[in-house]
């Protein structure tokens, strides 16, 4: 299954309404160079394990992200690889087993990247940068977000633990609302 290897990079929800900006403890500008790598992991406890959503930039055959009509309209060969925002939803059971639930892909475009940057800026998420320190020490955080820019700079946003405080809940809600909206506007889903 494709899901287990993505855990090393360290998941389905209805589209949510727009969220209010997160109160800032400090401000930081959003990097203005192209995003080279994006990896986000969200973990939510359920009765017999953990529901996980992994969202990342990934190159996939265009047929995985676009309908046959869209491929024809754009003149793209379905086997041609394109960069997409990919989502992998799965469950890790308490006994260590994994179950893949769904995959979603939507093309990563300049407009989508600009929209992502606007969300980061609107919620002052660059100020949440912990420079990877939490990811080094927190086991199974509720969320772990890594954005690497072509400039060589990166943004690391990791929750302080498996349970979210009010501020961390607002961070997660802002990002997942953007993700849900991105997938609601196009792309394909594989159950």
Model-derived features: positions:
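Short, well-ordered, aromatic-rich surface patches in folded extracellular/luminal domains
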Residues: 16-71, 104, 119, 123-191
């Amino acid at each position: 299954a494709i899901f287990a290897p993505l855990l090393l990079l360290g998941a389905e929800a209805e589209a949510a309404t727009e969220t209010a900006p997160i109160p800032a403890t400090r401000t930081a500008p959003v990097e203005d160079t192209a995003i080279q790598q994006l990896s986000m992991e969200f973990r939510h406890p359920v009765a017999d394990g953990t529901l996980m959503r992994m969202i990342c930039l990934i190159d996939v055959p265009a047929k995985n992200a676009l309908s046959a009509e869209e491929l024809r309209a754009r003149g793209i060969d379905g086997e041609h690889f394109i960069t997409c925002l990919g989502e992998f939803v799965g469950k890790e059971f308490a006994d260590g087993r994994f179950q893949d639930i769904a995959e979603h892909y939507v093309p990563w475009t300049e407009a989508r990247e600009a929209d992502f940057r606007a969300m980061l800026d609107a919620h002052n998420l660059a100020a949440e940068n912990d420079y990877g320190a939490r990811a080094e020490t927190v086991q199974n955080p509720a969320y772990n977000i890594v954005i690497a820019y072509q400039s060589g700079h990166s943004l690391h946003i990791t929750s302080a633990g498996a349970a979210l405080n009010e501020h961390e809940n607002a961070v997660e809600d802002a990002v997942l609302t953007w993700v849900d909206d991105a997938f609601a506007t196009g792309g394909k889903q594989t159950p």
